[in-house]
């Protein structure tokens, strides 16, 4: 029995898969093919009409994960049937995750919606092409938060297995599961913590230490470049982000080449202020081809940093598919932080989303 039929008490409407009672996922999200525009619109009309026939007294809320700012065809069609649509971005600085404030918003809204109208409301999940990696994380978060599935790693893997083999690799050049699991563990703490999420700490990201040199060239070495993306906590720009740090911007001298034969440890000084959701990328500069190759990526939230250090091995990093052999046994990346006492911890930023409130959101 697959995960999406585990709570299957009756046949769901055509075009939908049942995740839980009155919670459905559009089956187009699992397709590897592009549905022609005309067929796609017909498909949406038929699905929503059948839903209305099956649940005539229900209100419908659809979470849509998409790219861009324009109103989507999905939203335009669902509005015709008096449904409420909430649009979310399908990535955060290239990582198929949402910032913690949006995850909190999603959990709160879905919970309130399902509890409304004497538990008659219906929740729908939809993603536009390319949005499956994030949708898989969102579905796992929903299952963990509502205690419909246990074990963060097992739940995340089970949801990803529902998609056709190779879909995740097709849509994401890096394996996003390590960062997704980290954020799923954040979500799981909501069920046991009286304050969730905790205040986002303002920290100084002091340095990154690589222990045992990964092999990214013919000399078993690398020229590491660090880039850091996040929210500028000195502005009132809400969820907007930008590059906070880049090795290339800071250093005018040529990047140093580190080889396994010469050293065991690389220490890269950064001294960058961070707060909230942060994406840290480490790239290798290949001088032969004059291009940058992604070594690893990690996304984290400063609210959950303990003892001012984030310790990661190859299993905890988002890396290119089939590249684990580049990281020797015992490889470790350490991200060291310092306190920034001049800035007070703040709550997550105000969430501003594209929402059509037909009937109003809770």
Language-model-detected regions and their locations in the chain:
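Activation on folded, globular domain regions of eukaryotic proteins
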Residues: 161-162
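Hydrophobic or amphipathic alpha-helical targeting/insertion segments
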Residues: 129-134
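Cysteine-based protein phosphatase catalytic domain of the PTP/DSP
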Residues: 2-123, 135, 145-157, 166-170, ...
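Phosphate/adenylate-binding glycine loop and adjacent helical scaffold
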Residues: 126
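DPxDG-like acidic metal-binding loop motif
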Residues: 139-140
């Amino acid at each position: 029995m697959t995960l999406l039929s585990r709570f299957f008490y009756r046949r769901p409407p055509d075009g939908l898969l049942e995740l839980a009672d009155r919670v459905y996922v559009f089956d187009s999200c699992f397709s590897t093919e592009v549905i022609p525009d005309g067929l796609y619109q017909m498909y949406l009309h038929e699905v929503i009409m059948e839903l209305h026939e099956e649940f005539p007294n229900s209100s419908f809320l659809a979470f849509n994960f998409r790219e861009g700012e324009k109103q989507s065809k999905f939203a335009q069609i669902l509005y015709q049937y008096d449904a409420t649509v909430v649009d979310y971005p399908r990535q955060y600085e290239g990582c198929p995750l949402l910032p913690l404030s949006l995850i909190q918003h999603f959990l709160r809204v879905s919970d309130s919606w399902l509890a409304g109208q004497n538990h008659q409301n219906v929740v729908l999940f939809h993603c536009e092409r390319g949005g499956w990696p994030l949708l898989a994380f969102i579905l796992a978060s929903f299952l963990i938060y509502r205690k419909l599935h246990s074990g963060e790693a097992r739940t995340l893997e089970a949801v990803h297995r529902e998609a056709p083999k190779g879909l995740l690799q097709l849509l994401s050049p890096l394996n996003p599961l390590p960062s997704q699991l980290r954020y799923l563990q954040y979500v799981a703490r909501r069920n046991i913590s009286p304050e969730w999420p905790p205040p986002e700490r303002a920290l100084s990201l002091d340095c990154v230490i690589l222990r045992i040199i990964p092999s990214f060239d013919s000399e078993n070495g690398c020229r590491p470049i660090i880039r850091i993306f996040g929210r500028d906590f000195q502005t009132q720009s809400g969820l907007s982000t930008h590059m906070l740090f880049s090795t290339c911007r800071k250093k005018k001298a040529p990047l140093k080449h580190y080889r396994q034969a010469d050293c065991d440890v690389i220490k890269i000084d950064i001294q960058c202020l961070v707060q909230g959701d942060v994406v840290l990328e480490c790239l290798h500069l290949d001088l032969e081809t004059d291009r940058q190759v992604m070594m690893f990526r990690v996304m984290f939230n400063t609210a959950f940093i303990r003892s001012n250090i984030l310790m990661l091995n190859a299993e905890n990093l988002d890396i290119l598919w089939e590249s684990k052999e580049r990281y020797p046994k015992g490889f470790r990346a350490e991200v060291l932080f310092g306190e920034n006492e001049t800035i007070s911890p703040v709550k997550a930023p105000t969430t501003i989303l594209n929402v059509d409130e037909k009937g109003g959101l809770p």
